Amino acid sequence: MADVRRVGIAGLGRYVPERVLTNQDLEKMVDTSDEWIVQRTGIRERRIAADDQVTSTLAIHAGRQALEHAKLAPEDLELVICATVTGDQPFPATACRIGYDLGAKDAGGFDIAAACTGFVHATQVASNLVASGAYDNVLVCGAEILSRILDYEDRNTCVLFGDGSGAAVFMPHDRCQQGEYLGGSMSMEGGAEGVLAQPGGGSRHPASNESVAQRLHFMKMGGTKVFRFAVRVFAKLVKSVIEEHGVEEIGVIIPHQVNQRIIEAAMEQIGLPMDLVFCNINKYGNTSAASVPIALREAFEAGRLQKGKLVVMPAFGAGMAWGHTVLRW
């Protein structure tokens, strides 16, 4: 068996659609207000995909930027992983279209449907595949068009979510000398499928006139349960990193952009200042699997990824699933 290799992130990318949907726009659509949304979520606007865009469209933009950042030709990619719950279609995998349109000839591809935790889970899969020597160049995308599964008559969900994509290129660390993967976790609490879900369209509730009439094709969420769960596991994940590495090693925490109030409550529970956290939820809302890679790229652009310091990425969401990835930049 080959020796385990160190793995790094060679390139980062992000893309968000041009159309902006503000809280003021939503005031005209549902019974809500800018004040109500901001107080409860910290969100002021979100992006909405154009009618002629699909999830792979967004991912391809982000993937291309990540490849350019990594100085890697598309044909050198060996594997494409797409984290999404809003793929172009139920099957085949959206990763197949991403790889094809990017020009990743002969690359493998598959999707990971872990919702808000998807990108973090995908980073661990990619890192371990590169570490094992099975692959040298892996592209991981997190992409969502959540606006297509939102009920714009339900103010409890439609104000929270937006569309977007992010991407990262993984390769042996000796070739990129940055973003070294140090480890992470993947966990779940099963039996809570109904807390946050799109009930219709699968084998439990196949698509039918009846399922559409019952609005099962739209996202459903139990907000209070999600809030409590997210605060608890966010705090648990960051505390585990502190126990292993020490708080002084942390340069930035880039969490899943779930809700500003959840992030603030978790940081208060941990006892760390919000200055350590990179947040952009005010601009994009919750973009599920896209939120961490979008924020990671923007943190890079803002100079928040400090050389030699830890980048901690906790994520949590539907399933109920959670996990984290730790990098040393």
Residue ranges and their predicted role:
Residues 1-51, 154-228, 232, 236, ...:
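Condensing-enzyme catalytic core mediating Claisen C-C bond formation in acyl metabolism
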Residues 2, 56, 60-63, 67, ...:
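Claisen-condensing/thiolase-fold acyl-transfer catalytic domains that form or cleave C-C bonds
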Residues 10-13, 83, 113, 138-144, ...:
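Short beta-strand segments
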Residues 20-21, 91-93, 149-154, 322-326:
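Short acidic, glycine/serine/threonine-rich loops at helix termini
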Residues 30-39, 89-103, 140-146, 203-211, ...:
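Acidic-glycine-rich active-site phosphate/pyrophosphate-binding loop
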Residues 75-83, 248-256:
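Short glycine-rich phosphate-binding loop at a beta-alpha junction
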Residues 131-165:
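Flexible, glycine-rich active-site loops centered on histidine and acidic residues
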